[in-house]
Amino acid sequence: VASKSIPIQVIYLVIGVLIGLAAGYGVFSITTPSPRPGEVPTGEGRVYTIGFTLPLSGELSSIGKIWEKVVKLAIEDLNNEVKAYGLNVTFNYEILDDETKEEKALQNVQTFAQKGIKVVIGPAASAQVKVVKAFADENKIVIISPSSTAPTLALKGDFIFRTVGSDAGQAKALATLAYQEGARKVIVFHRNDEYGKAFADFFINYFKGLGGTAVSQPYQTGLADYAAEVSALAGRVQSEGFDAVVLVAFDTDGANILSHAAESAILSKVRWFISEGPHGASELLTQSIGEFAAKVRLYGTRPLFIANPLYIELNSRFKERFGLELSVFCENLYDAVKLAGWAIIRAGSYDGEAIAKALVEVAKTYYGPSGWTAFDEAGDKAMQDYGVWAIVKTAEGKYEFKDVGVYERGSIVFIEVAYE
């Protein structure tokens, strides 16, 4: 996925085109007879339910709990937007916890299918998306993941859509960041799952192409503690002379790994780089991890278009209402809700195939907090930008996540100083 910038001046024009088209199709939708399960006609119009399978517990729970709030805000905004155009349509939502587990995500999608729900947003992890794919395709249920990024799932002609670019792009950005920062011999410490393995493979290929050397060291997922795994990593770093560690993790495992790394004299002497997975998790904002981040000059990448005023506006509203900053993929989740709603309206019938086709068309002209949402031929976000983030100390002595750079035209450009 190439990193491309979108001119800010087209934002409002694009949104106007989207809403104009969607509103026109919405009038047709309201007059469509024969409601199906998941679509409820009332005296005041039609009510549609969008299903959500989110990681409210398990390895992505820190981020999942933030996402739950994003869903609430996005549904409210969608309903207000629809009503502003005079459409007698209301969207409800149902959230089920998938515990960041593959089989639980499948159970949730099956539960939604039994209720006649044709659009499900989530699951979060690529391993989960891989498991639900066959059922979704067979039953023509539209799956929109805001965060699955494994390149191995970039497949044509299925019912899986992703409002984020695949890690083929992010791995290139992270490899560029590490090399530009002086890393030459890297060990990639990664989750031994669909996401981690694919990310590591792409990173290693890109990093070698830049002139560096890199090897992978997978770790088992789902452990209560990673002390032994971090100890083994330290031993290998010392014996083989690596000058940097690249961590590809989720939030709970990532925080646990960094907490143990902070106690290692060996791992505190090499540079650290990190994927988007742990971004936004409060567990990373402890004093020990914050001090470690400064010591090793920890930088990460994440899908983000920093110069997007719609993202800034959403983050401001979210912080005012919930007292929190947006975490990784919040903007992708928000846009997934908007796309799903307008695709249902535009489809003209509550049918998975019709909604999938409408989704592609709506995304072509929708520009939201995550940027331009057009899909490529595999159903992934076609134009994905990447930002660089760090963990920095505030004036009050606390720690926070901060976006400090961008991946632009094949190189990293820092816009703020993260570490002295």
Label each PLM-derived region with a short phrase.
Residues 1-42, 417-420:
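Secretory targeting signatures
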Residues 13, 112-124, 144-146, 187-190, ...:
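Periplasmic-binding protein-like
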Residues 35-41, 45-47, 62-69, 81-155, ...:
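Beta-alpha junction/loop-to-helix N-cap segments that form part of ligand/metal-binding clefts
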Residues 46-49, 87-92, 115-120, 138-143, ...:
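Loop/turn elements at helix/coil->beta-strand transitions in domains of secreted/extracellular proteins
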